[in-house]
């Protein structure tokens, strides 16, 4: 399924005063849902918008930590420093989905990595999303095909064991992957989260021991329930995430669930002020119900260089149409 998304973090200006953010040293294919009910918009007080300019905290040309807006602008694949211009192909796991993704107009390909059901770290990592436990595609095969393209990649690791088992495969193709590479894991419990988290320190240590120059995508486990009021990302959640990331030197994007962002804007705005390395990636669960108005609210609250949108249809099309970005189906 094809989705679209934006964002990059930067120097933050509140009103006319520039706030110096401390930087420490060191679902698959384009898919249009026939009928998706939109929840009634919640009228919340709008937090003060932060004006931001892009910072050069990411890596240089061709590095895994290069700002994706910089990379795709340089390659003339987008026209502006706007996270909403970045097109995503989500869950490009099986070979047919991977093939569709490589033929598509997507800039970034997202895929999930796990170990086969035996859980052995010596097993071959495969491309699948739970509850699946098998796949016709291994990570090694996936990388062999994707390296032939110029697309950026985001790999979502479902366990620490999967990450550890994947590092050598990534290292073997590193010289052929001179483009943005995002490494993702859910490292903290979030709103309604019930899935097991990946140990943050062990995950970060594992990845940085092989690839110190990478972009991290660090998220919260979440859930969404159609018959109850869903709380957003709380202050303790965002403060703990900042604590985990504060000693990193790499760019970090925080994947946040679209249906939970509007009620969390104050907390997430605060989080982005903590470092020029931070950004958001808005994503959607396949069964989530939320109005397109929520995406427009997010667009109004955050700077367009700080937020990427890896979202499903029909909201993706409606959102892009509303902000004047053409979507190629």
Predicted regions and their residues:
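A subset of signal/propeptide-processing and intrinsically disordered low-complexity segments
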Residues: 17, 29-30, 107, 305
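Sequence-pattern detector for short linear motifs
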Residues: 14-16, 29, 34, 43, ...
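Phosphate-group recognition and catalysis centered on beta-loop-alpha active-site segments
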Residues: 2-5, 10-11, 38, 45-46, ...
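Intrinsically disordered, low-complexity polyampholyte segments enriched for Lys and acidic residues
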Residues: 22, 34-35, 40
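N-terminal chloroplast transit peptides
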Residues: 1-25, 29
């Amino acid at each position: 399924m094809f989705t679209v998304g934006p964002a990059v973090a930067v120097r933050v200006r509140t009103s006319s005063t520039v706030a110096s953010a401390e930087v420490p040293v060191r679902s698959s294919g384009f898919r249009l849902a026939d009928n998706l009910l939109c929840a009634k918009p919640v009228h919340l007080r709008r937090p003060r918008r932060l004006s931001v300019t892009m910072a050069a905290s990411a890596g240089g040309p061709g590095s895994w930590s290069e700002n994706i807006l910089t990379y795709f602008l340089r390659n003339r694949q987008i026209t502006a420093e706007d996270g909403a211009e970045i097109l995503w192909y989500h869950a490009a796991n099986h070979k047919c989905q991977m093939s569709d993704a490589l033929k598509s107009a997507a800039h970034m390909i997202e895929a999930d990595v796990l170990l086969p059901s035996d859980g052995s770290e010596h097993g071959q990592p495969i491309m699948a999303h739970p509850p699946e436990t098998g796949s016709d595609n291994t990570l090694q095969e996936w990388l062999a095909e994707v390296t032939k393209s110029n697309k950026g990649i985001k790999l979502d690791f479902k366990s620490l064991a999967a990450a550890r088992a994947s590092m050598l495969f990534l290292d073997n193709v590193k010289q052929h992957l001179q483009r943005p590479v995002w490494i993702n894991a859910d490292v903290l419990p979030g709103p309604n989260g019930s899935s097991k988290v990946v140990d943050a320190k062990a995950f970060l240590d594992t990845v940085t021991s092989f690839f110190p120059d990478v972009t991290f995508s660090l998220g919260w486990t979440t859930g969404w329930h159609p018959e109850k009021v869903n709380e957003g990302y709380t202050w303790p959640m965002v403060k703990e995430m900042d604590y985990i990331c504060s000693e990193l030197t790499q760019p970090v994007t925080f994947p946040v669930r679209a249906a939970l962002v509007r009620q969390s804007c104050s907390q997430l705005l605060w989080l982005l002020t903590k470092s020029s390395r931070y950004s958001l990636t808005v994503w959607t669960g396949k069964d989530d119900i939320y109005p397109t108005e929520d995406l427009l609210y997010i667009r109004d609250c955050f700077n367009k260089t700080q937020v990427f949108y890896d979202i499903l249809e029909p909201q993706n099309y409606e959102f892009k149409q509303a902000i004047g970005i053409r979507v190629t189906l």
